[in-house]
Amino acid sequence: MAAGSVESQRSQAASERPVAGQAGVLPCLELPSYAAACALVGSRYSCLVAAPHRRHIALSPRYLSRKRTGIREQLDAELLRYSESLLGVPIAYDNIRVVGELGDIYDDQGHIHLNIEADFVIFCPEPGQTLMGTVNKVSSSHIGCLVHGCFNASIPKPEQMSYEEWQTLEIHVGDELEFDVFRLDSDSAGVFCIRGKLSTTSLQLKHSAVSEDVAETVVEEVVEKTPKKKKKKKDKDTDTCGTVDSVTEVADVTDVTPQEETDIPCSDNVNDFFEEEPKKKKKKKKRHQEDQDPIFQASDSSGYQSDHNKKKKKRKHSEEANFESPKKRQ
């Protein structure tokens, strides 16, 4: 019973334990097929190389009857990880060929050693080269890109660039971005990571695109604003004309109303009404004469002109006439 229980526990552990080759594949990244990878080789800034390579593989004894499956599991586990023998990172392979008819067993080791050949597509960038990536993250400190759909690249904000300038680049998720390779890193598991920096061409393109957008918006605003200003001027002219007309109408009304009121007698007696009419006529005649024959009025020392001297002269003439008339009678 104890032996049976131990064997059952071992079988459960073996079933729960993941396969070595499957554990090596990164599930979060999309691996391209060999045909898709070969199509990317000819693209600009790909840094991909397609070439055949020979590899040494230690095959487990359990794969003696299915050698191709064992070889594929080992090669799949090495994808997207830096390989010193390949001097790069393999992303796809095809056309596996076993070199030699027999394998080798060394000493008391249970693995069978084989040499194989396969066509690999290798990603081998170097510092200073230019890459093309798809933006998948934009933050205030860096930009994240995905190269060939499977390699992460981080582009930090330059130290000499201000936060406002960094925001004016207008880089959005999904945009294609060119950058220069600054450094290549890999962690303890061999996961490949790229450190990059913005290239001068990408900065110039972004700045030119931003300047063109700004120029277009300014032109559109000017075109939209100019007819509005003309309308405002027309409205102002119409308003001024309306105000002038209203002012003239008000002036006419004010000129008419006092005349009508002055012509109406204020007294209740009829005699007063008839007495006031000749006085008004005399006043009108005097005004008419003064308008035709201007008289220079006397002025005081202060410069104020008055009719008081004229009245005095008239009184003197009347008194002299009255004084001479009784003498003549005598």
From Swiss-Prot:
InterPro entries: RNA_pol_Rpb7-like_N_sf, RNAP_I_Rpa43_N, RPA43_OB, Rpb7-like, Rpb7-like_N. Its main location: nucleus. Widely expressed. Residues 251-330 are annotated as: Disordered. One of its GO terms (cellular component) is RNA polymerase I complex. Belongs to the eukaryotic RPA43 RNA polymerase subunit family. Component of the RNA polymerase I (Pol I) complex consisting of 13 subunits: a ten-subunit catalytic core composed of POLR1A/RPA1, POLR1B/RPA2, POLR1C/RPAC1, POLR1D/RPAC2, POLR1H/RPA12, POLR2E/RPABC1, POLR2F/RPABC2, POLR2H/RPABC3, POLR2K/RPABC4 and POLR2L/RPABC5; a mobile stalk subunit POLR1F/RPA43 protruding from the core and additional subunits homologous to general transcription factors POLR1E/RPA49 and POLR1G/RPA34. Interacts with RRN3/TIF-IA. Interacts with RRN3/TIF-IA. This is DNA-directed RNA polymerase I subunit RPA43.
